[in-house]
């Protein structure tokens, strides 16, 4: 048996999980050894909070706290800054990296993983391994982002 949580709007998912008392139940079962698989919104809720989602806040959840299965935040579907495209669509908006840096400015002890498409973080015991064919980016307050190769043990970078 395992727990599988897919995508959708993270705010809505978190609101419903809190509403039905499932956040605590899922967290407890997963922390007791039941495998957890999450992608998109499902990866966001594995984090301590939903604060690094890309979703619109279409509802107000009871709390931004999520499952806290991992000690860092994930930004799924991470897109690298592309200055030419960003210039064309820049309407006072921000890149993903800008948003992550804003988050880190007020959450200075947290790390954020920019997880690109078709990538996953496989947790085995206390080790975190990047799976898939693309690099991931680790953001930490006051430091340059670090890119890590697929199939690497990324534990020391995210803990």
Positions of PLM-derived features:
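C-terminal and late-domain segments of enzyme folds
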Residues: 2, 50-52, 56-159
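Hydrophobic alpha-helical segments and helix pairs
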Residues: 2-8, 12, 25
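Catalytic nucleophile loop
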Residues: 4-7, 29-49
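Short, active-site-adjacent cap segments at secondary-structure transitions
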Residues: 10-11, 43-46, 120-122
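Glycine/threonine-rich flexible loop motifs
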Residues: 10-20, 85-86
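Charged helix-capping and loop-helix junction motifs
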Residues: 17-24, 58
